[in-house]
């Protein structure tokens, strides 16, 4: 699915050249795997690293030299937010149209109607595509465990089976528009208090029977192209770069081959981000990394710190190529 998402990007940049003149990565007649590998071979080390982290609050850089566009993300699960300024939260004022404020996902789940969920996903996906967004930051399927969670309305209830069966058609509807659905927040993210520091303690039975089924169905039935990690910790390791949940379960047991992105400011360690399954690091200018920097995004864990480790020979490029691929 990571190749599918990248293939959509390649399709958007195909140049009006004859088949003989086209490089393989722009030749729509070639298999997507071949096109991706050709594009990968043309990227410099610096260009590859730039593809793994944010360049603004809601985008990551493309590669203009090869005609590869930026990736633009957008909130949220029940409506396309107005565009905001590059490094401020004020509205940019660059659009004068309106978007639909859809019912929250808790309302959608209450219909028990997968066909309605498909229509919902198709509709919000159309609006995301109209706004030239690559990734919709939703839907959310965290399980209700406390009524004090102020974000419960974003999710699909307390029943893992219902949430999974309702989220899958939503995902398919969004992605029919060529927009990636980003299912969040993986996983065990069930309240907002101390969300960056809470270390969740749960046994495997509860994990697999309550907290993971909706995500598993999102991947295996919905075909999600993207997953967002959660802020909290599990087994003492942040879930945006958690070996057990991302590599062992998501990519290993479930066979997910899409893109794992961090929640905004949810990355905390370069080594873990490299090795533990994270593909793209997102956040804002104010992640505590901006002191003295002309561009705070260069200080992200998967930015210059990652690039320097490669240049110093402390880490190879196998993981980098996988993230970019």
Language model regions located:
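Bacterial Sec-dependent N-terminal signal peptides
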Residues: 1-22
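Glycoside hydrolase catalytic-domain context in secreted enzymes
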Residues: 20-325
